[in-house]
């Protein structure tokens, strides 16, 4: 028998279960493999004397602990559980360790220092010591080491006052105790040691307690990063303290209070309480359990009992869990990406920083193998460029681990050249370059010297010879190719002479050479650019893009070759003729920007050549340069306006609180915080932040930081979020943040807006106050505070890593972009300025949101009022902008108007802004132009008439067509704006006069007030009349114009008396309007507005109307409006409603419409008193009004050239002929809403037929009369006839509508013999007048024309035959189409486009699935994908036995043939034997050579189902669905995402679910239900016994006889049942479906010829695979639906298909 040596390491491995249990009791876990590695390698390499075989010596253990507990990156937190367990075995040894403990050593006497020596205090690895200023003192220890230090429950805690006894006289051997063994050695003097010891069992098994010292707590806090900065490091420190010291509840609180802030401590405790386990081990929500396990107040735990220590151990574990939970930060991969390798940083150091970033900013552990891929990618792409490029080029990079990459990176790093080597290399390269250049220069100088020496001789030799010719791209100076001499960089240049042209917009240096003359400076996109005028250039050229480039390119041919250059996008160019949009060529190689012929044409430039050179002028001969001056006078442009600045400085000094420049951000102290009310149904909206360009982000970042510093913004966490949009300020590079609050505005309650209307705001400004002060409040909305409950509504995302911001910000003040902000601020400012208005009643203060206008009668009053206003604003917390202030001036700009001497003008800036608008190119730009110009319509006479051609282009859905008319209107508006006059301010103390004129449906007027003997214009008014009023006679149109303009003028007059002056005496017309033209509602409205005697007066008619600006004829055109309206007739002057005495015909008309059998039927009739003149049915759905119109129109048409009296009982038809017809015609057959009137075609036909009779009288008679009068008899007969006609067959539509409006004459139709045969069958009658055959009121169309019509109709619509039939029946064609249904079917079936696109309509009967004859013989297999994949498992391989339905499912990480073969050989074959048949789809894993080879070797018949036909694998596909659905339900129930763990439960369910025959797969296989234990049954003795083997075999035999054999017979019976096959046979032409179609690609391809067929699939030519019958459709009609023009079956030229004896061959033949 051999003997083995037992070491401490082998001893622990032999008792490993006890070692692991001891570690678990201490709250840690240890691993056996790592235990061996640490003992044999890691701790040995620490060089502290640790032996390879291990030791239980406390000295060695303490030395290892110092290394492991070292602070910062030098420690080893992962090794703390292992060394702690070693110490536990040494200090509290079990029985199998005691024989191996080292003998106790006598303590070495401590030497006494002769004199106090100053020494720097040293800190331990875990418990650093504070330096002390007191003299060294010996440690306070009890005299007897065996005596207890402290009784935890009876004695007071330390420190204790102790004396300084003499040192021990000699060594003595003390009795070792656990406390003494735990005293750690210090590297400093013993007098300066600070001990912090854990709670341990001392003598007599009493717990001894030493609290933490102040120095330990201080050093832990000062030598470790705070929790917010590095939570991982601090958590590891606290974990080591909890493990090694085992502190009490009070010590834990003291430790948390010292190392964490209040907020962090609260978060840790909250996270810890969430992890308190319940009875089932899961986190509980019971408050009593939580308070008992993790109390917030000091508990009454007795640490001398096991229960108390167990409470404390669980408390420490929960505290660690809380620390880790609170340490989790939101994932911020952007912070990880910012960790890049430094220039001189080693790859190892960089990797450590990268891992630390992963721990700090992500919840992922970089040491986790699952995260290795992301860490590797970050390590590669964030390395320095040289290392990154070489790592990316490594072969087989996907197989490298992180350690492999680190080694490669270290190799690359070590091979780097040093800075000295790099400098040496660059110096050598520069030296070689200089040598080469010097050599070339030497050759050049030698050549020059030689040429100068022999100049005369060479000239004589050369004679008349020319110089050496240069290349087309060769420089004549340096002889290099690629440029010309004028662009040669080596050519010396003369200093440019001083230019007399100053380019104010040049953004380059002051000494830059301008382009040569002639040159012009234009503004491109707001930036000035100086161009060289080049008439030879077809297009203008820019050398700098200054914006995005388009994808359009142009080939530029130059002297040195040709090259493609890109165009810029459309830029706005300011020309002398206005602003246009233009696209430039971007040619960076061009020396100067070129002004080509394209822009010169738009500029209308003129070039004059004089003795001084070329001169470029504008269209009127004026120079195009704006400013020319000498350079020595340039300084005058920058001289400050000293007077105005000094005055402003005085105001800033006297009122510092009123200005934003001196008072800072204001706050309205008198206003309560604004509370926003949400709608009742509002829910939070969260919209992600849009991607923001870097330039824009940098532009708004200073503004965000400024508002954060001012407290306008603050960080928050809100369920609301809206995006932030950076908007670039025009003409600058600055951006301002604008928040998109549209979604928030939708969810906020609307309030009534009380903001003043700028249209009439200045009406309250009296002309008697000519001194003005204008103040613009700065950041006005930010002066109002926002309630804390409403602040979260306006949150937005913002990230600023430089200041540590990553999250949401929100506004603490009223934000801009909120829909109610203007109203809320306007009301708040009004209330704050109410006291000012009361104190200064003589002043006029106008307020438009944040724009204030103060008007006074004198300058003194204006100064005093301005001072008081500034003081009020400053006291209330508002701030005005000193930059925009206009103080005590007689001419100011307010709301875009210039105010002076009681008048207002349009500002020059506003005119220039409108004049610079380029020609619109879409509807949106037209609306923008009309909106901008419409703001100035008060200054433009007849603006509505000028802009009339532009308004139709603004309607949605209208095709944008910019023509000459629109261009003229566009230019006329700009011209009218240039000549806009000055308008007087409305004086509400004086009466107003309104001159009105109307022309072609446009109302124009001038509102004036008297100024001495003159009439001063106040406003020019214009508007277009509505559609109804536009159709009235001129006098009534004038009434409508007066009503519209009086309403608009009321906004300016504010209810003051108004006198109306027109050229029509309309007052009598208003008082007695005609009933024929006006409705009662409109008549009442006009009278209520215009007959207000207190406000509206009608003046005398005038002959000079300022509205038209044209003199009227002398004396005017005086007329009586009532008389003119009375003389206004309808379309026919002699039309009357009285019977004609000499009438040739007296007829009665009527139309009937009613619903019968769910369908509306209609008819019309014309009769006399006793006989029917005409009657016809009308199309289904015809209304009664339409029928009346048709009947009356037919009567007028038949009475052509005769005197007719016609009676109708329709008010609608009677009013149309006498009144409304003329009104409809005048207004363009439009309703008052601008829509087309109903029955438009019938009304037009009726108005045209009114002129056919010689004389006409249309009389209205009551309907359904009783009596014997002629009118009653005729009306009853017409009514009965119309009803009778409606009940006749109405499949043939009436021809009246098309006959009433005759189109162009067509040539007569020619009927062939087949058409005449059809005519005879239909018994149609011939119409000799038109030369056509008529059938049921319809004209029979020849068949060839009918087929052509249907063919063209199908080509236009590509509708189906049924749809086209419905379309033809609904339309009133008036034609009978012979064989319509046949032609419709033929055309649709022969359309190739429809065949390639339309879906097939092949229906099949129920299929029969082939199954196995017994279990295990026939399987189906398939892969299914399940996301999200857990632990790399993303696929599930499913096998199903087709006989029993038994399923097997295996998780897989990859969908490969290797997985299929592995599971087939290792799982299916050992359990169920070799399958006979295996079915699957055409997936790559199944058609792979590996899978097929395995099946061939095992003798398995592997059947591949049809492609793109999941039904072929229906059984396994249905099982996939069942498994997925059950997994989804279980994950919802359990809350677990690990579907692999839940898979056994799913398989149990599907194996015990009854199938079609009521049996479960388990019962089919085993003959009984699965065994189940009733856990709630007290008697379980019945489950303890099991049947014998013979009983099992007998049961299986019964299963085979009673279940499996009948089941196989049932399957066989289904297979033998005949199935109706598909209708395709060999030789047919079919279309084949494309399963993956591209955009606008046909759905079907072909046609193909069928070669072979099976009951379910086909083989066609040109396609290798078999195709399922559901994936094809017939390419032409079947045999029973052959086209009439197709060749017959006996056609000798037709191919025939015959079968042969060989089933794989067919015979094709054709007769000759």
From Swiss-Prot:
SUPFAM superfamilies: Acid proteases, DNA/RNA polymerases, Retroviral matrix proteins, Retrovirus capsid protein, N-terminal core domain, Retrovirus zinc finger-like domains, Ribonuclease H-like. Its EC number is 3.4.23.-, 2.7.7.49, 2.7.7.7, 3.1.26.4. A motif (PPXY motif) lies at residues 157-160. A lipid is attached at residue 2 (N-myristoyl glycine). A motif (LYPX(n)L motif) lies at residues 126-130. A zinc finger (CCHC-type) spans 473-490. Mg(2+) 3 binds at residues 1422, 1481. One of its GO terms (cellular component) is host cell plasma membrane. The active site is at 534 (protease). A zinc finger (HHCC-type) spans 1354-1394. The record marks 127-128, 197-198, 445-446, 502-503, 627-628, 1297-1298 as: Cleavage. This is Gag-Pol polyprotein. It comes from Feline leukemia virus. The gene is pol.
């Amino acid at each position: 028998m051999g003997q083995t040596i037992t070491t401490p390491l082998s001893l622990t491995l032999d008792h490993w279960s006890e070692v692991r249990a001891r570690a678990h009791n201490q709250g840690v876990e240890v691993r056996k493999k790592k235990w061996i590695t640490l003992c044999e390698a890691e701790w040995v390499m620490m060089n502290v004397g640790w032996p390879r075989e291990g030791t239980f010596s406390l000295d060695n253990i303490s030395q290892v602990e110092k290394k492991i507990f070292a602070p910062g990156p030098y420690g080893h937190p992962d090794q703390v559980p292992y060394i702690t367990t070693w110490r536990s075995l040494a200090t509290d040894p079990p029985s199998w360790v005691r024989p191996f403990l080292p003998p106790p050593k006598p303590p070495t006497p401590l030497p006494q220092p002769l004199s106090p020596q100053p020494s720097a205090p040293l800190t331990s690895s875990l418990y650093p010591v504070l330096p002390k200023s007191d003299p060294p003192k010996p440690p306070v220890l009890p005299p007897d080491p065996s005596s207890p230090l402290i009784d935890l429950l009876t004695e007071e805690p330390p420190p204790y006052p102790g004396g300084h006894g003499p040192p021990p006289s000699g060594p003595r051997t003390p009795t070792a105790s656990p406390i003494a063994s735990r005293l750690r050695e210090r590297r400093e003097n013993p007098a300066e040691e600070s001990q912090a010891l854990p709670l341990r069992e001392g003598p007599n098994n009493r717990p001894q307690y030493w609290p933490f010292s102040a120095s330990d707590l201080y050093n832990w806090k000062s030598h470790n990063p705070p929790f917010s900065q590095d939570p991982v490091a601090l958590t590891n420190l606290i974990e080591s303290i909890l493990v090694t010291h085992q502190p009490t509840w009070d010590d834990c609180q003291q430790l948390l209070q010292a190392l964490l802030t209040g907020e962090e401590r609260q978060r840790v405790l909250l996270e810890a309480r969430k992890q308190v386990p319940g009875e089932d081990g899961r986190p509980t929500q019971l408050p009593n359990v939580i308070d008992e396990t993790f109390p917030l107040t000091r508990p009454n735990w007795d640490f001398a009992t096991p229960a108390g220590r167990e409470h404390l151990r669980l408390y420490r574990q929960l505290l660690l869990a809380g620390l880790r939970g609170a340490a989790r930060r939101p994932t911020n991969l952007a912070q990880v990406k910012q960790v890049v390798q430094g220039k001189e940083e080693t790859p190892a150091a960089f990797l450590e920083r990268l891992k630390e970033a992963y721990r700090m900013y992500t919840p992922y552990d970089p040491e986790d193998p699952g995260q290795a891929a992301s860490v590797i990618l970050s390590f590669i792409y964030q390395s320095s460029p040289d290392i990154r490029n070489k790592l990316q080029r490594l072969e087989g990079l996907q197989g490298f681990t992180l350690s492999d990459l680190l080694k490669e990176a270290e190799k690359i790093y070590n091979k780097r050249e040093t800075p000295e080597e790099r400098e040496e290399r660059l110096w050598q390269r520069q030296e070689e370059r200089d040598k080469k250049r010097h050599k070339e220069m030497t050759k050049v100088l030698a050549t020059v010297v030689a040429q100068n020496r022999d100049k005369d001789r060479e000239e004589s030799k050369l004679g008349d010879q020319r110089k050496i010719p240069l290349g087309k791209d060769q420089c004549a100076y340096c002889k290099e190719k690629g440029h010309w001499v004028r662009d040669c960089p080596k050519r010396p240049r003369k200093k440019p002479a001083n230019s007399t042209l100053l380019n104010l917009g040049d953004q380059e240096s002051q000494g830059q050479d301008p382009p040569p003359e002639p040159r012009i400076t234009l503004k491109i996109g707001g930036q000035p650019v100086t161009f060289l005028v080049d008439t030879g250039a077809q297009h203008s050229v820019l050398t700098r893009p200054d914006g995005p480039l388009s994808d359009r390119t142009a080939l530029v041919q130059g002297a040195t070759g040709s090259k493609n250059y890109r165009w810029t996008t459309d830029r706005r160019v300011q020309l002398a003729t206005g602003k246009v949009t233009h696209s430039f060529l971007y040619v960076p190689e061009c020396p100067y920007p070129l002004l080509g012929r394209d822009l010169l044409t738009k500029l209308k430039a003129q070039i004059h050549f004089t003795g001084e050179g070329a001169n470029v002028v504008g269209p009127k001969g004026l120079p195009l340069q704006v400013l020319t001056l000498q350079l020595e006078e340039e300084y005058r442009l920058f001289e400050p306006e000293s007077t105005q600045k000094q005055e402003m400085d005085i105001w800033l000094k006297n009122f510092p609180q009123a200005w934003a420049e001196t008072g800072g951000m204001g706050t309205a102290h008198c206003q309560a915080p604004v509370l926003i009310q949400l709608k009742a149904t509002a829910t939070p909206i969260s919209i992600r932040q849009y991607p923001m360009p870097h330039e824009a982000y940098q532009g708004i970042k200073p503004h965000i930081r400024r508002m954060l510093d001012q407290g306008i913004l603050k960080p928050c966490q809100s369920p609301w979020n809206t995006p932030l949009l950076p908007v670039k300020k025009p003409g600058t590079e600055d951006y301002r943040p604008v928040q998109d609050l549209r979604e928030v505005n939708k969810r906020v309650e609307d309030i009534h807006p009380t903001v003043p209307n700028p249209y009439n705001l200045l009406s309250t400004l009296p002309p008697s106050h000519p001194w003005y002060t204008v103040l613009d409040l700065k950041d006005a909305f930010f002066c109002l505070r926002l309630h804390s409950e409403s602040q979260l509504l306006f949150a937005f995302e913002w990230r600023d890593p430089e200041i540590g911001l990553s999250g949401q910000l929100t506004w603490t003040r009223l934000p801009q972009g909120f829909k109610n902000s203007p109203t809320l601020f306007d009301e708040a400012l009004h209330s704050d300025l109410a006291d000012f208005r009361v104190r200064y009643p003589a002043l006029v203060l106008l307020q438009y949101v944040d724009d204030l206008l103060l008007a006074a009668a004198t300058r003194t009053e204006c100064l005093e009022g301005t001072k008081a206003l500034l003081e009020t604003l400053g006291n209330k917390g508002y701030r005005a902008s000193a930059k925009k202030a206009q103080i005590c001036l007689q001419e100011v700009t307010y709301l875009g108007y210039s105010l002076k001497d009681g008048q207002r003008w349009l500002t020059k800036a506003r005119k220039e802004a409108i004049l610079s608008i380029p020609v619109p190119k879409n509807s949106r730009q037209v609306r923008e132009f009309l909106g901008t110009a419409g703001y100035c319509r008060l200054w433009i006479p007849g603006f509505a008439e000028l802009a009339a051609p532009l308004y139709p282009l603004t309607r949605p859905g209208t095709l944008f067509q910019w023509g000459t008319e629109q261009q003229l209107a566009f230019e006329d508006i700009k011209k009218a704006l240039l000549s806009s006059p000055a308008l007087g301010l409305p004086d509400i103390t004086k009466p107003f006069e309104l001159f009105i004129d109307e022309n072609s449906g446009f109302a124009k007027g001038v509102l004036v007030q008297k100024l001495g003997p003159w009439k001063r214009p106040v406003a020019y008014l214009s508007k277009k009349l509505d559609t109804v009023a536009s159709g009235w006679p001129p006098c009534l149109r004038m009434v409508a114009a007066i009503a519209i303009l009086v309403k608009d003028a009321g906004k300016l007059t504010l209810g003051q008396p108004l006198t109306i002056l027109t050229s029509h005496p309309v007052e009598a017309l208003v008082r007695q309007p005609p009933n024929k033209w006006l409705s009662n509602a409109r008549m009442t409205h006009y009278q209520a507005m215009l007959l207000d005697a207190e406000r509206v007066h009608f003046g005398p008619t005038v002959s000079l109307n300022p509205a038209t600006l044209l003199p009227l004829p002398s004396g005017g055109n005086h007329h009586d409006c009532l008389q003119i309206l009375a003389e206004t007739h309808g379309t026919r002057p002699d039309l009357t409603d009285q019977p004609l005495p000499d009438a040739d015909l007296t007829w009665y008309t009527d139309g009937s419409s009613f619903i019968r059998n769910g369908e509306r039927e209609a008819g019309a009739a014309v009769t006399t008193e006793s006989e029917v003149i005409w009657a016809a049915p009308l199309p289904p759905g015809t209304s009664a009004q339409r029928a009346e119109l048709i009947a009356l129109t037919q009567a007028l048409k038949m009475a052509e050239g005769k005197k007719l009296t016609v009676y109708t009982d329709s008010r609608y038809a009677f009013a149309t002929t006498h009144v409304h017809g003329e009104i409809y015609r005048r207004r363009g057959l439009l309703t008052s809403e601008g829509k087309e009137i109903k029955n438009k075609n019938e009304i037009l036909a009726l108005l045209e037929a009114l002129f056919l009779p010689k004389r006409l009288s249309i009389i209205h008679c009551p309907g359904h009369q009783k009596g014997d009068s002629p009118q009653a008899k005729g009306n009853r007969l017409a009514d009965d006839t119309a009803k009778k006609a409606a009940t006749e067959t109405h499949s043939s539509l009436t021809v009246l509508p098309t006959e009433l409006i005759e189109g162009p004459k067509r040539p007569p139709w020619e009927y062939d013999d087949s058409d005449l045969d059809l005519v005879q069958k239909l018994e149609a009658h011939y119409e000799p007048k038109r030369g056509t055959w008529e059938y049921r009121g319809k004209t029979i169309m020849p068949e060839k024309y009918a087929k052509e019509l249907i063919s063209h109709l199908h080509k236009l619509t590509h509708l189906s035959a049924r749809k086209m039939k419905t379309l033809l029946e609904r339309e009133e064609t008036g034609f009978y189409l012979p064989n319509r249904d046949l032609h419709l079917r033929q055309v649709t079936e022969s359309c190739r486009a429809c065949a390639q696109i339309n879906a097939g309509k092949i229906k099949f009967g129920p299929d029969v699935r082939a199954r196995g004859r017994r279990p295990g013989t026939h399987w189906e297999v398939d892969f299914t994908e399940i996301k999200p994949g857990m632990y790399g498992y993303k696929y599930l391989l499913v096998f199903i036995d087709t006989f029993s339905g038994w399923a097997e499912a295996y998780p897989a990480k990859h969908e490969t043939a290797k997985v299929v073969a592995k599971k087939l050989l290792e799982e299916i074959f050992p359990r169920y034997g070799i399958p006979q048949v295996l079915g699957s789809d055409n997936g790559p894993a199944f058609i792979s050579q590996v899978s097929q080879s395995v099946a061939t070797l095992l003798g398995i018949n592997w059947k591949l189902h049809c492609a793109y036909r999941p039904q072929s694998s229906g059984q396994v596909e249905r099982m996939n669905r069942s498994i997925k659905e059950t997994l989804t339900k279980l994950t919802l129930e359990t809350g677990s995402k690990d579907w692999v763990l839940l898979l056994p439960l799913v398989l149990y369910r599907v194996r015990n679910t009854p199938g079609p025959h009521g049996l479960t797969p388990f019962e089919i296989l085993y003959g009984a239900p699965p065994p189940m234990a009733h856990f709630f049954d007290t008697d379980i003795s019945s489950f303890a016994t099991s049947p014998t083997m013979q009983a099992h075999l007998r049961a299986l035999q019964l299963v085979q006889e009673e279940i499996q054999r009948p089941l196989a017979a049932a399957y066989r019976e289904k297979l033998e049942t005949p199935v109706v096959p598909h209708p395709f046979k060999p030789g047919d032409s079919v279309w084949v479906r494309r399963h993956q179609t591209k955009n606008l690609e046909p759905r079907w391809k072909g046609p193909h010829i069928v070669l072979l067929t099976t009951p379910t699939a086909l083989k066609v030519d040109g396609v290798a695979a078999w195709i399922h019958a559901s994936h094809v459709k017939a390419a032409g009609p079947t045999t029973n639906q052959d086209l009439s023009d197709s060749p017959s079956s006996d056609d000798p030229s037709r191919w025939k298909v015959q079968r042969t004896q060989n089933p794989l061959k067919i015979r094709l033949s054709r007769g000759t």
